[in-house]
Amino acid sequence: MNSSSSTMNEEPDALSVVNQLRDLAADPLNRRAIVQDQGCLPGLILFMDHPNPPVVHSALLALRYLAECRANREKMKGELGMMLSLQNVIQKTTTPGETKLLASEIYDILQSSNLADGDSFNEMNSRRRKAQFFLGTTNKRAKTVVLHIDGLDDTSRRNLCEEALLKIKGVISFTFQMAVQRCVVRIRSDLKAEALASAIASTKVMKAQQVVKSESGEEMLVPFQDAPVEVEENTELPDYLPEDESPTKEQDKAVSRVGSHPEGGASWLSTAANFLSRSFYW
């Protein structure tokens, strides 16, 4: 009884912490601070060995975002347990195929951080092809869609949006940037962005526009058609679908120029680090 009550009183729990870190890491403005923090990176490494698969997958998503910042890669590679934990995820027979691929991509990025750009690109592609073996031949190329969502202004609206997106067959993953009312969604290439807009419109309180870049590099908001699009729904909520490399990385960079609020992210890191230090000493 005591152990169960102490678990209930533990606030926040592992999944909420790792999801918050993942969402913070999605913003390029926060990536250096997260890696420099003494508690967050070691905590993410420990999360890779967590018994709950969604915690492991979310930790890997956070690490992949952090590794997109070149300045972070050497420190991440040298962090105690990083490369070994990634290898363990890749080699563990019970790891889902999409999680193996994600861990393999991070491992390749970090392992290749001291190679020339050409060598790094070739080696990463080679390893990615090997990782693809775990998924068979059905994996489809993924793309990134950046949405500006009118009405995405509090936690309850965010939860509604999450529920709507999770129902769509073909959604791989998504992260929110609440300060700028945006959601970065990874989807299969055969899924139309209009399906995302229809799902969000079904909440009745939010409306999505797509963020695109003009030829001059300026951001534009493109409205979707008002006519609803038929959406193929998941009959049961699966793990995240496997994804391949995204051909629309520029859209992530477009979002990075819009300031979120790094001060808020930095202050939250203290809370996360305190939780991590309390939770992982046994």
UniProtKB/Swiss-Prot annotation:
Modified residues (N-acetylmethionine): M1
Record region (Disordered): 239-261
Location(s), subcellular: Cytoplasm; Mitochondrion; Mitochondrion outer membrane
The entry's keywords: Acetylation, Cytoplasm, Membrane, Mitochondrion, Mitochondrion outer membrane, Phosphoprotein
ARM repeats: 39-81
Superkingdom to which the source organism belongs: Eukaryota
This protein's GO CC annotations: cytosol; mitochondrial outer membrane; mitochondrion
Sequence intervals crossing the membrane: none
Molecular-function annotations in GO: metal ion binding
Annotated positions of the Phosphothreonine modification: T137
Residues modified to Phosphoserine: S189, S246, S260, S267
Ranges of compositional bias, category Basic and acidic residues: 246-255
GO biological process terms held by the UniProt record: intracellular distribution of mitochondria
Primary role: In association with mitochondrial contact site and cristae organizing system (MICOS) complex components and mitochondrial outer membrane sorting assembly machinery (SAM) complex components may regulate mitochondrial dynamics playing a role in determining mitochondrial length, distribution and motility.
PANTHER family: ARMADILLO REPEAT-CONTAINING PROTEIN 1
Assembly behavior: Interacts with mitochondrial contact site and cristae organizing system (MICOS) complex components IMMT/MIC60 and MICOS10/MIC10. Interacts with mitochondrial outer membrane sorting assembly machinery (SAM) complex components SAMM50 and MTX1.
The protein's name: Armadillo repeat-containing protein 1
Organism lineage string: Eukaryota, Metazoa, Chordata, Craniata, Vertebrata
